[in-house]
């Protein structure tokens, strides 16, 4: 084990573009469904829908947060609709399935998506049995990362001491609140859209291109 991480008791992972590669393109499918949902909601064309979608994403952290605030959208209806995508692009990751159980302590998923979708993805990757808990958008009170409130709820819910916790995420802005709480942070810099938005070097302890490669280096030795 990397000596810089021997104090870590709780390992927290983002889901999309973190536990699977951004190159999978899965979020592009969700993006398309979000656009279609907004077209139906507002009766607008695809160009306007895309503009609205991205504005909400940039201003509120997620498209859903903006739609709830400005258009009183039901979160359950929205999430069920946009996550109704095929998951064939997501491949089973046997290596990740071997590495995660070797991490000392507990493992959690912290996602701006919802739990049903997250469980489907984790099943596809082959790692659904390796996590003690899942903290989704409903659990944050619909205040998505990087809103600090969701991180505080995560820690309170599972009894996590930030000083002994690590968060891996593909978006720097989501690491900033974690670092402020005292967590160790890992930026999975693998090409996510706006992954470097709000870049703050002092909020990043480790910068890695591939989560599996990094975990192999961290754990070292043989299984």
What are the roles of these predicted feature ranges?
Residues 92, 110, 143:
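Residue-level marker of regulatory loop/turn positions in helix-turn-helix DNA-binding domains and
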Residues 1-9, 97, 101, 114-115, ...:
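Asp-based, Mg2+/Mn2+-dependent phosphohydrolase catalytic module
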Residues 44, 73, 105, 160, ...:
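Short glycine/serine/threonine/alanine-rich loop segments
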Residues 100-108:
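Internal catalytic-core helix/loop-beta-alpha segment
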Residues 21, 109-111, 187:
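Hydrophobic residues in well-ordered beta-strands that form the structural core
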């Amino acid at each position: 084990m990397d000596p810089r991480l021997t104090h870590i008791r709780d390992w927290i992972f983002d889901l999309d573009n973190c536990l699977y590669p951004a190159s999978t393109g899965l979020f592009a499918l969700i993006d398309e469904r979000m656009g279609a949902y907004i077209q139906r909601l507002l009766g607008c064309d695809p160009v306007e829908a895309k503009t609205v979608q991205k504005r909400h994403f940039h201003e509120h952290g997620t498209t859903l947060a903006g739609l709830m605030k400005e258009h009183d959208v039901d979160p359950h209806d929205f999430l069920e609709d946009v996550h109704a995508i095929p998951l064939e692009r997501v491949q089973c990751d046997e290596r990740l399935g071997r590495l995660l159980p070797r991490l000392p302590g507990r493992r959690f998923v912290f996602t701006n998506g919802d739990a049903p979708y997250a469980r489907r993805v984790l099943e596809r990757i082959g790692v659904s049995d390796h996590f003690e808990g899942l903290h989704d958008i409903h659990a944050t009170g619909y205040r998505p990362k990087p809103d600090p409130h969701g991180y505080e709820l995560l820690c309170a819910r599972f009894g996590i001491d930030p000083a002994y916790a690590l968060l891996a995420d593909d978006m720097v802005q989501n690491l900033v609140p974690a670092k402020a709480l005292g967590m160790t942070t890992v930026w999975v810099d693998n090409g996510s859209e706006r992954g470097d938005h709000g870049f703050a070097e002092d909020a990043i302890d480790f910068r890695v291109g591939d989560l599996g490669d990094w975990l192999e280096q961290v754990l070292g030795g043989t299984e």
